[in-house]
Amino acid sequence: MAEIKKSKETKKSKDISKNDISYKYMPISIFDVQKMGKKGIRGKRNWSKNKTVPSSRSTYSPFPPDVAEWCAMYFLRDKNNIFDPFAGWGERHKAIKDSSKNYIGFDISPKAIEHAKKTYNVDNILANSMTDEIPTHDGLLTCPPYWNLEKYESKDGLDHDDTWKNFLENYEKLWQRVTKKALSGSTYCIMVGDWRKKNVFYDLSYQTEKVMEKCGMEPFDKVILSYKKISPIKLLLPQCKRLGYSSKVHQYLLIYRKP
């Protein structure tokens, strides 16, 4: 009888593991991002001797599908209407769609919207989160643009602000607009990182935390998204050692809730 009972418990455990995302991705504070098998949508990085070594942050596009899936099925598991103010290339939309939730994603790039449709068969909306009406939502999954690091073809985006100060001012205005349409109890998943360019350090993760506090959002969790296993560390280290700073091989997943 004991053996039969044990067998039933084992089978039950296996069945649970198929449906519980916490079995697929360990709910711990350091998440090892999986390799996506390509350099990124915007093309390969130029590592030639005639070019300066670019910021390691430029390897972090597109959005990691495993992170999107984990957010959709774990942090947003009890949410239904997910908004994305920077919809991007479609990975997040697909993850939300696969988890049987509603997704509305705004993006100012026709190229990104076309890619999302062609690659993932999802329909993002050509709209600007700075000016267009924000939909009511109870969840959010996004990754904001990294000023002076990535440029889109539309000149209406935050990435085209002429200074870091102007970027941060408009960044806060955008989040004020978005969070006002979030229902009480909403959960936000924001993937964000820091980077260095031309010897200047840009702390977008800290700036985002400050903005969320101003918007009345409460911190719920923070996860380190580690790219250590898939980053070209050996290529980055010489310049880091010469200038005395660390190579950025991680991003953050900031989880916020609206009271």
Which sequence ranges carry the predicted segments?
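Class I S-adenosyl-L-methionine-dependent methyltransferase catalytic core
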Residues: 1-259
